[in-house]
Structures are given as structure tokens and as C-alpha cells.
Amino acid sequence: FSEDEMCQLLSRLVEAEEFEQFLHTRYIGQKRFSLEGGESLIPLLDTLVESGAPQGVDEVVIGMAHRGRLNVLAHLLHKPYEHILSEFEGAADDGRGDTEGDVKYHMGYSYDHVTEAGRKVHLSLSYNPSHLELVDPVIEGIVYAKQAYLRDEEGTRVVPVLVHGEAAFTGQGIVAETLNLSELDGYGTGGTIHIIINNQLGYTATPQETRFSPYPTDVAKQIQAPVFHVNADNPESVVQAARVAMEFRQRFKVDVIIDMWCYRRYGHNEADDPTLTQPLMYQQIAQHASTLKLYTAQLVEKQRIELHEVNELHDRARGRLDEAQEVAKKLQVAPRTATFGGVWQGLSWATEDRSADTGVEREKLQRIAELATQAPEDFSLHRTVQRIVK
């Protein structure tokens, strides 16, 4: 890693940690499903985008549950802090109905990211319900449709990324179903990059209570996907795993899994006290330095960065959040997320007095019906099929 890469990695960890701590202290008790303990997810996703672009990636479509979602929205999708904080401040919905009343950690977003090399990559985070892993086949369908629209026959231009919890990855059958379809004609998308935020707890259940295999990724042996087990407290290893995963996916067009071992700094949500159910584990976590502190100490010791420079990064991150909160407090209505852009430009929601025009010309339907009941002259039909056709 070059000195610039190390400093950039440190900066992203600062932003991720400061964001979570800001929400923790300013909005006490509000649910946010913190990423703390797994902040390396942000540079991991950064790396997938930056390393994928020179390998032909034009779009990345992401599906994930609630853990760390706000952090991803803020720092990968660049959803403005003001918009996120306005939802914490209680700003009303705009009343137009598509996401009215939904919680902040279900929301999606899209963003056109320009890489350091100047290449544009379109990023999409799909909306998600509380039902864990339900979004998996939805993402695959979105990517399949995009690839068809772009005539991306090799599947290199649009890449699906699914972020899982380790308990859900083994516990939800929809994961196994999605894996099983991954390389079938009519379903395959050229490989999915799976990221497991392995915080070693499923709400209050330990791994021993949710599976009997050593790793949550063992369920993926059915498709023989390569798995990279990596320690989130070693962010450089996380970045390296992401680089290899993207290169492997682009070259071999198969699923790849990154099993990022980390921990959950607080409870399942902000109303959960984990010391009641995992007292020994949380005694250790309370004494454990954050990924950012560990990496900061490492870079300072190597003389890659001065401590005052690190403090400046923290001050800058806090300052941006403070400014955003002042703006958010003045917003009476939460800013609406733009829904119809890109290839959806010109479309709008159907209303009571407006329905979509779904009609097809009679001549076109007749022509389709005729072709559907014809067989090539040199094709020998089964006699039962022949009676139906003729």
C-alpha cells in the first residue's frame, strides 16, 4: 500500500466511525443498526467500485439489510447528511406515497460515482424490507434486466453485490435458492459478490446456536464459490480481499464470497442491551479498540501520518455533521429521493386519475399468435404437440 492509499483508507474509517458516533450521541435510543465494529465495510465497497471500473464495470447494484445501511447510504451512495439527519429529526414525508411512513434504514438511493481515474460508475442501493435476505433474488433480477437492456452478454458491465449477516446467510433458505440459480441459463448474472458482515451474533443467538459448521459460508459449498475470510480490524487485508474478489468475478463469471469477521459494538439495535445475553463477549468488546484506533496507531508508528493530521480528519468529519444537523433541523419535509432517472426518465407513478398505457396494437398481437402456433418445416413435432399446433 502506498502512503496515499493508507491515508485514504484512514480517512474513510474516520468518516464511518464519526458518523456512527454522531448518531449515537445526538439521537440517543433511535434505531440505526450501527456499523460500529464493522466499519471496514466502507473501504471494502469503495474498493469494489474503484477496482471494478478499469475491468469494465459500469454499474454496481447493491442489496443489503439494515446493519450499516445508513453508513453505506452516506459514504458510498453519497446521500446527503442533511437528508439522513432530517429523518432523525422527524421531518414529515412529502406525502406522495411511494415510501411514505417507511423507516430510514429501508431506503434506497442511486449515485453516479466518478472514480479516481475519471470513469463513471452508476451505483444503486435497492430499497429493502425488514425481511432478511428477501432482496437477494430481487437484486439478481434487476441486474439480469439491466444486462439484457445493455446487451451485456458477458455480464461484466453490471455487477450485483449482496451484503449479508452471518446468521441470515445460513438461516434463510432464500440464500441457498439464490445461490443455486447463480449459474443457470436464464438466471445467472455473471457472478455475485457476496459480503458477509460476520459479527458472530444473530440478534442474541451465538454461531453454535444457529449452525453446526465452522463458517457461515459453508452453505455456499454447493456452488464451490471461492471464499475469502478476512479480519475487519485489518482494513488493508479487507481492501486486498475486495480487489481479488472483483478480479476473480470479472475473469471467471462466478459468485465470490468475502467473509468479513468483525463484531457488533452495541446491541442488535439501539434498544437492545447485549450485556444481558452475551455478558462475557461484551466485556471483551468494551475493552477492544476500534478498527480506526488500531489502524491510526499502526500508521503513526510507521510514520505514515502525523497525529495532528488524524485529528484534523476527525475535526473535519465532525464539522460536516454539525453543519448538516443545523440544516436538517430546519427541514419540515424530508427531501424526496429521485426515483425515475436514467433509463426510467419520463416515467411516473400511476394515480387514481392516471393509468399507464399498456395496450398493444391488434395487428401485433395477431402476428405474435400466428408465430406462436407455427413450427419450422424441417422440425419433427411430437404428434400430441402437432395436434395442438394444427
Task: Pin down the residues of each PLM region.
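Conserved internal helical-beta-strand scaffold that buttresses enzyme catalytic cores
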Residues: 1-175, 179-208, 212, 223-228, ...
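Glycine-rich beta-alpha junction loops
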Residues: 66-68, 262-265
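Active-site-proximal helix-loop-helix substrate-binding element of RNase H-like nuclease domains
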Residues: 217
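C-terminal catalytic or substrate-handling cores of phosphate/nucleotide-
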Residues: 229, 242-250, 255
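Short acidic loop-to-helix transition motifs that present clustered carboxylates
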Residues: 233-238
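Flexible glycine-/small-residue-enriched beta->alpha junction loops
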Residues: 283-287
